[in-house]
């Protein structure tokens, strides 16, 4: 389906964030049958202040037959910080991993870029069809790889977490995210509903993923400083990483 084009925060952000936001939405529109996913009105576009700087958050959400929620968040804190955050939450009736991607930048540079297709199975492995497709992608060598956080055992062996050191490395990261998205969307379209037992396991896997992601202290601290701990907790658990039911 088509959606009315709206001015986006991405036009004011780092070029890689703008390019990645466009890339994600282009892949979604190309492959999937999108319909709107409605957030509470007060959480779609949010403004606040942090350390004297204006904080702006823009959320766009969709859903499809295979994904209960596809969330693209853009955030900006004056000239200090630019953020892109994206997660595709599968419906538990489908045996699909979690696509996640984040960019963090400030003062004209990207300091962190991460993308992954994270397994939700108890044995922490991706479906074989994913492993086969991802293993065929060329190995990328970045000059400044970064270490995953302590709770990062939710990520797969194909996870990329880097500080892009040049425009060429930014382009490499962008290209790999598009490859992840193409693989993920095509696998989702070809997938079939699973057994009731597998649905229960998928729910448990998504709960684990969301619970671990809610431990991201950096995100929580920024939100608490700008909006207070109650608002931050609500946003973390209803917008960013809501648990499936």
Swiss-Prot record:
Catalytic reactions of this protein: (2R,3Z)-phycocyanobilin + 4 oxidized [2Fe-2S]-[ferredoxin] = biliverdin IXalpha + 4 reduced [2Fe-2S]-[ferredoxin] + 4 H(+)
InterPro entries the record matches: Ferredoxin-dep_bilin_Rdtase, Ferredoxin_bilin_OxRdtase
Source species, domain of life: Bacteria
Keywords: Oxidoreductase
Enzyme category, top tier: oxidoreductase
GO biological process: phytochromobilin biosynthetic process
Molecular-function GO term, any one: cobalt ion binding
Pfam families reported in the protein's UniProt record: Fe_bilin_red
E.C. number: 1.3.7.5
Coiled-coil residues: none
PANTHER family found in the cross-reference section: PHYTOCHROMOBILIN:FERREDOXIN OXIDOREDUCTASE, CHLOROPLASTIC (PTHR34557:SF1)
Entry similarity comment: Belongs to the HY2 family.
Protein task: Catalyzes the four-electron reduction of biliverdin IX-alpha (2-electron reduction at both the A and D rings); the reaction proceeds via an isolatable 2-electron intermediate, 181,182-dihydrobiliverdin.
HAMAP family per UniProt: Ferredoxin_bilin_red
Name by which UniProt lists this protein: Phycocyanobilin:ferredoxin oxidoreductase
Organism: Nostoc punctiforme (strain ATCC 29133 / PCC 73102)
Gene name of the encoded protein: pcyA
């Amino acid at each position: 389906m088509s959606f009315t084009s709206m001015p986006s925060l991405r036009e004011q952000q780092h070029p890689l964030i703008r390019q990645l936001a466009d890339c994600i939405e282009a892949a979604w529109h190309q492959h999937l049958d999108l319909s709107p996913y409605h957030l509470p009105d007060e959480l779609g576009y949010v403004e606040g202040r942090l350390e004297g700087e204006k904080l702006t958050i823009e959320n766009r959400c969709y859903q499809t037959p295979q994904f209960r929620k596809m969330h693209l968040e853009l955030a900006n804190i004056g000239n200090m910080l630019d953020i892109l955050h994206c997660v595709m939450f599968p419906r538990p009736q489908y045996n699909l991993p979690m696509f996640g991607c984040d960019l963090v930048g400030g003062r004209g540079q990207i300091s962190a870029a991460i993308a992954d297709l994270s397994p939700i199975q108890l044995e922490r492995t991706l479906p074989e069809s994913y492993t086969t497709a991802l293993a065929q992608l060329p190995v990328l060598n970045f000059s400044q790889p970064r270490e995953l956080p302590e709770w990062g055992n939710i990520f797969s062996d194909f996870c990329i977490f880097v500080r892009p050191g040049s425009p060429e490395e930014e382009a490499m990261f962008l290209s790999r995210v598009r490859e992840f998205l193409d693989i993920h969307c095509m696998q989702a379209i070809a997938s079939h509903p699973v057994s009731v037992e597998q649905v229960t396991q998928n729910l448990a896997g998504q709960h684990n993923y969301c619970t671990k992601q809610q431990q991201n202290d950096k995100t929580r601290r920024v939100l608490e400083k700008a909006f207070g701990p109650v608002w931050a907790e609500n946003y973390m658990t209803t917008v960013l990483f809501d648990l499936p039911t």
